A protein has these predicted regions:
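Charged, often Cys/His-bearing segments associated with DNA-binding zinc-finger transcription factors
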Residues: 1-42
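Short, amphipathic alpha-helical "recognition" segments used to contact nucleic acids or chromatin
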Residues: 49-63
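Short, small-residue-rich loop/turn micro-motifs
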Residues: 32, 60, 206-208
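Glycine-rich, flexible loop/turn motifs
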Residues: 2-5, 10-13, 44, 131, ...
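Short secondary-structure boundary/capping segments within folded domains
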Residues: 17-19, 45-48, 59
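Short, well-ordered secondary-structure "scaffold" segments embedded in the functional core
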Residues: 50, 64, 69-273
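A short glycine/serine-rich beta->alpha loop
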Residues: 40-46, 249
Length: 273
């Protein structure tokens, strides 16, 4: 669908179709137009308008259609679809307006600066080499693991880190510890229990021991932690509304990190609207 045909839809329908609200879409178009005007050699003009190039890219990330399908829908060559998607993604990331915050986020209440971390897995095609490196025993398939660091007070994702599916969540957390070392508390699930040894104050459920049932106070504490921590599950759900992250990833793995960071930045923008 071309951009001109979207004018008849309401704002809520536009977001459902495209994946982002109209104001965010307009800002992305502005970034692409600025980049186009700064080109020293314009070269051959693109068959599609800037708005349609962005729409094609968002359609790819949101619905994860094959590039052949997109080529047929937009009446361009399949290779042109691939170049367009890559160009739009690169321009948005280089603009720094659609990236995750680089500086440590602080709030007025410095006595309780905290983050929530969680890892989610995205299935990939079976690699030709090093299959065991990407095999997830939990999911029983080959995956890439994405660790999401969320700052509840600012309502922003402040970091997304990628590793192979076989790596344990806590190992990935220890590799990226610099991103949340300024925080007093880290809220996690029981898979991150060992982070306590690294000097972090963990907010996590109390584990039930064999033959020792939890007291009512401990059960209430676990419920309270669960109610607060569920926000990270909602964030993971928002990320996976873009089917490129929820379906089996068919592309080369080297651009997976760029794409999930771009999608995380879009989720941040939508949550701050």
């Amino acid at each position: 669908m071309k951009y001109q045909k979207l004018n008849r839809f309401s704002d809520s329908e536009f977001k459902r179709l495209v994946g982002v609200p109209r104001p965010v879409f307009s800002e992305m178009v502005e970034v692409l137009k600025e980049a186009e005007s700064l080109k020293k050699k314009s070269g051959r003009p693109h068959t599609l308008a800037i708005e349609d190039q962005l729409l094609l890219t968002l359609n790819y990330l949101r619905n994860y259609s094959t590039q052949l399908e997109l080529a047929a829908n937009y009446h361009i060559a399949e290779s042109n679809v691939n170049r367009t998607i890559k160009k739009v993604e690169d321009v948005l990331m280089k603009s720094r307006r659609f990236t995750l915050p680089k500086r440590s986020i602080t709030t007025a209440d410095e006595q309780f600066n905290w983050v929530i971390i969680d890892a989610t897995e995205c299935s990939i095609e079976r690699p030709k080499k090093n299959q065991s490196k990407f095999y997830s025993g939990k999911k029983k398939k080959h995956t890439l693991k994405a660790q999401v660091i969320y700052h509840p007070k600012s309502k922003q994702i402040i970091g997304v880190d990628i590793s192979s599916g076989s790596q344990h969540d806590i190992k990935l957390a220890r590799k990226t510890v610099k991103k949340f070392k300024h925080c007093d508390y880290v809220m996690t699930d029981l898979g991150y229990y060992g982070l306590e040894q690294d000097g972090f104050k963990l907010l996590m459920p109390i584990k039930k021991k064999k033959n020792f049932p939890l007291f009512d106070a401990e059960k209430n504490y676990n419920k309270m932690i669960g109610k607060i921590r569920v926000v990270i599950e909602h964030i993971n759900s928002q990320l996976k509304r873009f089917r490129i992250l929820s379906e089996r990833y068919r592309n080369r793995r080297k651009r997976f990190g760029l794409r999930i960071n771009l999608i995380a930045a879009l989720v941040n923008r939508m949550n701050l609207q």
